[in-house]
Amino acid sequence: MLICNDKFNPKTLLEEIMALRPWRKGPFEISQIKIDSEWDSSIKWDLVKNATPLKDKVVADVGCNNGYYLFKMLEHKPKSLVGFDPGVLVKKQFEFLAPFFDKEKKIIYESLGVEDFHEKYPNAFDVIFCLGVLYHRKSPLEALKALYHALKIKGELVLDTLIIDSPLDIALCPKKTYAKMKNVYFIPSVSALKGWCERVGFENFEILSVLKTTPKEQRKTDFILGQSLEDFLDKTDHSKTLEGYDAPLRGYFKMLKPSKR
């Protein structure tokens, strides 16, 4: 949890926080008020925080949401830190949080998506984190190309995506929805993802972790509006989504942009 112990009027502060719902990423604690977000993002952060050193590096978080991971990255003392997300609400959340967790104003927040950010930042970053974005893209190869082009030579990508458990070079393409999400298009096997990344130009593809999503990590709280994981799974078989697909399984990966291609 990210904690700020500055003192504020608790009633006014809570009203501001609730007006910014839903809170997907977190948790945060400000002046003893806990923002109990839908996702316990510390679980994912613990899996990727030591993937590569960030000290004195130029670092990006693509699909940064409200900045939870950006604030955690500050603790590793990067040279610079840029977050990218086109969402309007999540930027408002970041602007609310930044005075508490980025008091030195080190983070740059850009309202750009994965398809667009590399045009403004070509060959710019030593490390890019892209967590929970790829399966939302209609063209995952184009998204991977954008990430590749935004990295410096010998830069590293830390990637998290939904995956399917299969030894084959295949991807699940949900017919209409996946776990009630309409914007999920391609969920690859690890082998298929490795092939995509290598076709784009990445090398040294490394599996960091594979983890099932559980209610410990994603659940309903008072700080979101609507449903969460328990509503997206089959009521009698939690190994399946409501649509009959395998329940969410996430892979965490690291790869390198080589010096020559």
Curated annotation (Swiss-Prot):
GO terms for biological process: tRNA wobble uridine modification. InterPro entries: CmoB, Mo5U34_MeTrfas-like, SAM-dependent_MTases_sf. It is an enzyme of class 2 (transferase). It catalyses: carboxy-S-adenosyl-L-methionine + 5-hydroxyuridine(34) in tRNA = 5-carboxymethoxyuridine(34) in tRNA + S-adenosyl-L-homocysteine + H(+). Keywords: Transferase, tRNA processing. CDD domains: AdoMet_MTases. It holds the Pfam family Methyltransf_9. HAMAP family: tRNA_carboxymethyltr_CmoB. Homotetramer. Catalyzes carboxymethyl transfer from carboxy-S-adenosyl-L-methionine (Cx-SAM) to 5-hydroxyuridine (ho5U) to form 5-carboxymethoxyuridine (cmo5U) at position 34 in tRNAs. Belongs to the class I-like SAM-binding methyltransferase superfamily. CmoB family. This is tRNA U34 carboxymethyltransferase. It comes from Helicobacter pylori (strain J99 / ATCC 700824). The gene is cmoB.
